[in-house]
A protein has these predicted regions:
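Extracellular polysaccharide-recognition and catalytic grooves
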Residues: 1-158
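Ser/Thr/Asn(+Pro)-rich, low-complexity disordered segments
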Residues: 7, 11, 106-411
C-alpha cells in the first residue's frame, strides 16, 4: 500500500504539472468536469503529501478563476465537448459548477446547489480574486482564448484488467476555444487544426453557442436533431459576436438552432424573417440568425434549416454596443452575405470579412487564414499563461497574483 500511495502521488503531481503547461480540461461538459473536480477536492482534503496538496490547491484556484472569467451570472459560457442533446445541460443546465460557484460567490440567492453540495464540506475555498471577478459588473467586453488538450487518435485501447475504454491523447495537442464575453452574453466556439486527428472525447458532441444574462436557462446554440453521439459534427469560426457554422457530418440529421426564450407560431412552417434574418431579443441581448441557403423552418417546437447542409450565421449584440434593437437590425440587414455553393462570405463593418469554404473547410478573416492555433494556454485581460511555462498571471483591478507550478508557489 505505501508503494501504491507513493506512485499515485507522483502520478497526480505529474498530471497537474502537465495540465498547467498544456491546458486544463479535455471536455468541459459540467457532468464530466464535476467528476474531475470531486477527485481533486478529495486529494486536497486527504493527501498527506504537502507538495501535492499545494499543487491541487493552485490548480483548483485556476479552475475557479477561469469559471469567474467565463461566466454570465454564474453560468459558464464557452464551447465544451461531450454535451449531449438528450442531457438537460444542453438546453437548460450547464449548472453543476454554476450552482457551487453561486454558493461560493453569492451570485444567485435562489440557485440550488445539489450535485456538488458535498464539496462544501471540503476545507478548500476559492481565492478572493475569483469572487471579485465573478461579481464585478464593469468588466466590459473581452476575448478568452484557450488551448486545451484534444489531439490524439481515434484509437480506443481496451485494457485487459478493466472493462473500460482508454482514449489516446497527445497532451500537447491543440484544440482552441474562443469565447467573447460581454456584460449581457458570453458566446463561444471550438476549433482545431484538421491536419491531425483529435481524440474522440474532444470531438464528441461539442456544444457551441451563447448564454445570456437574465435567465440561467437562456441559450442559443447549434445542434443536429438526434440523440445519438456525434463527433466533430460542425466546424466553426468566430470573432467577437459573429459565429459561422457548417455541418461536418453526413446523414439525414436536420440542422437545428436552439433559442430560449423563443415564441413559436401556432402552426409549423416557414419562419418569418427580415431579409433572410431571424431577429430576436433575449433580455438585454439581441440575436440575428441566417442560413446561407434555404429557409428557417418551425417543426414540432424546433427551429430547423430547410437545407441541412447550409452554412449559417449567428450574430449577437446588445444595447451597450449596438444601440436599440432597431439599430441592431438595420446594421445586420445592411451586412452583405453571399454564398456560391462553395464559400459563404459575411461582411460586418466592425468585425470584418468572414469567408468559409464548406468544401475545403478553409476559413479566412479579413483576407488572412483563420488560425486554429494559440501561443498561450490562456489569454484574456484577467489571466494569461504561456504554453509550457507552468506559470499563470492573474490580474484584476490592480491586484496581481502569480501561480508558478514549477516552484509550487503563489505570489
Amino acid at each position: 500500500l505505501p508503494e501504491f500511495v507513493s506512485h499515485s502521488e507522483e502520478f497526480f503531481i505529474k498530471y497537474i504539472d502537465e495540465r498547467a503547461k498544456t491546458g486544463l480540461f479535455v471536455e468541459g461538459a459540467e457532468n464530466y468536469r464535476a467528476v474531475t473536480l470531486e477527485s481533486l477536492y478529495n486529494i486536497y482534503d486527504f493527501t498527506e503529501n504537502v507538495a501535492l496538496k499545494k499543487k491541487v490547491e493552485m490548480f483548483l484556484d485556476i479552475v475557479w478563476i477561469e469559471y469567474a472569467i467565463e461566466s454570465i451570472e454564474g453560468i459558464r459560457g464557452g464551447a465544451k465537448a461531450r454535451v449531449y442533446n438528450r442531457a438537460t445541460d444542453a438546453a437548460s443546465g450547464l449548472l453543476w459548477t454554476a450552482s457551487l460557484g453561486s454558493l461560493y460567490f453569492n451570485l444567485n440567492e435562489d440557485e440550488k446547489c445539489e450535485t456538488l453540495i458535498t464539496l462544501i464540506a471540503s476545507s478548500y475555498r476559492p481565492p478572493e480574486i475569483a469572487g471579485k471577478i465573478a461579481k464585478a459588473e464593469n468588466k466590459g467586453n473581452y476575448e478568452v482564448i484557450k488551448s486545451i488538450p484534444g489531439k490524439g487518435t481515434t484509437e480506443v485501447i481496451k485494457l485487459t484488467n478493466i472493462d473500460m475504454p482508454v482514449y489516446t491523447l497527445n497532451p500537447a495537442g491543440d484544440v482552441i476555444t474562443y469565447e467573447y464575453v460581454t456584460p449581457t452574453y458570453a458566446a463561444g466556439t471550438m476549433c482545431h487544426d484538421e491536419s491531425t486527428p483529435i481524440t474522440l472525447i474532444s470531438s464528441q458532441n461539442r456544444w457551441e453557442g451563447a448564454v445570456f444574462k437574465g435567465d440561467k436557462n437562456a441559450r442559443i446554440y447549434r445542434y443536429l436533431d438526434t440523440d445519438k453521439s456525434l463527433h466533430a459534427h460542425f466546424l466553426s469560426m468566430q470573432k467577437g459576436p459573429v459565429m459561422i457554422f457548417k455541418k461536418n457530418t453526413s446523414g439525414a440529421f436536420d440542422t437545428g438552432i436552439y433559442i430560449y426564450p423563443y415564441s413559436f407560431a401556432e402552426a409549423d412552417g416557414e419562419i418569418k424573417t427580415e431579409g433572410g434574418w431571424l431577429f430576436g431579443e433575449i433580455y438585454d441581448s439581441y440575436y440575428a440568425v441566417r442560413a446561407a441557403s434555404g429557409k428557417l423552418l418551425q417543426k414540432e417546437g424546433k427551429i430547423l434549416l430547410s437545407d441541412s447542409e447550409s452554412p449559417f450565421v449567428i450574430h449577437l449584440g446588445n444595447k451597450i454596443d449596438d444601440g436599440s434593437f432597431e439599430d441592431f437590425k438595420k446594421n445586420i440587414k445592411s451586412n452583405p452575405l453571399t454564398f456560391d455553393g462553395n464559400s459563404v462570405c459575411y461582411n460586418d463593418k466592425r468585425w470584418g470579412r468572414f469567408e468559409f469554404n464548406i468544401k475545403t473547410a478553409e476559413r479566412r478573416l479579413n483576407g488572412k487564414a483563420f488560425s486554429c492555433k494559440a501561443e498561450n494556454i490562456m489569454e484574456c485581460p484577467f489571466i494569461n499563461s504561456v504554453k509550457n511555462s507552468g506559470i499563470f498571471e492573474v490580474t484584476f483591478e490592480g491586484e496581481k497574483i502569480i501561480y508558478d507550478f514549477n516552484e509550487n508557489t503563489v505570489k
